[in-house]
């Protein structure tokens, strides 16, 4: 155990966050997502909600402010502009941890799958809400 670090951040996830560099992406996905077949390192967070894991990650990892958008969700199938309550929760987390970077962009389902294949790692949660999938692009920590 460590002080001031969310216990949802397992040793494996902490090591992954530390190893990631500027511009690397991390996918945090729901229980229905085919994480094991993504071809990426899969970190299990069974029993955890995607929003709780995202909050823990965002408490330590800066988002990329060199790009127009650093956070992405999977669009609702057959409804490119469809909004779900979980998307509002993602936005609230972005506003809390990265107020200047609170933009959240939807990506078509199959394009999302392809993007996840390029992510540094995938965190597979126990989230049961549909479309509980999020990609975060790592930024930089500026010197004090």
Q: Can you say where each PLM-predicted feature lies in the sequence?
A:
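Catalytic cores of large soluble enzymes that bind and process phosphate-bearing ligands
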Residues: 1, 5, 45-49, 78-82, ...
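Long, hydrophobic N-terminal alpha-helical segment
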Residues: 1-46
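Generic secondary-structure signature for well-ordered alpha-helical cores
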Residues: 6, 10, 14, 18-22, ...
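Conserved mixed alpha/beta catalytic, RNA-binding, or beta-rich assembly cores of soluble enzyme
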Residues: 24, 30-32, 40-56, 60, ...
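Structural motif
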Residues: 24-27, 41-42, 64-74, 101-103, ...
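Glycine-rich nucleotide/cofactor/substrate-binding loop typically near the N-terminus or early
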Residues: 45, 54-93
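Glycine-rich, aromatic-bearing surface loops/beta-hairpins
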Residues: 78-144
């Amino acid at each position: 155990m460590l002080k001031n670090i969310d216990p949802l951040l397992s040793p494996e996830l902490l090591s992954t966050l530390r190893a990631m560099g500027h511009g690397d992406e991390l996918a945090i996905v729901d229980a229905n997502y085919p994480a094991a077949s993504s071809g990426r390192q899969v970190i299990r967070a069974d029993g955890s909600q995607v929003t709780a894991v995202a909050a823990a990650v965002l408490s330590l990892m800066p988002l990329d402010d060199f790009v127009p958008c650093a956070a992405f969700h999977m669009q609702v199938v057959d409804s490119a502009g469809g909004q779900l309550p979980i998307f509002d929760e993602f936005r609230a987390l972005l506003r809390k941890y990265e107020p200047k970077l609170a933009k959240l962009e939807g990506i078509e389902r199959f394009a999302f799958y392809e993007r996840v294949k390029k992510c540094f790692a995938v965190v597979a949660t126990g989230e049961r809400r549909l479309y509980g999938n999020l990609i975060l692009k790592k930024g930089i920590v500026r010197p004090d």
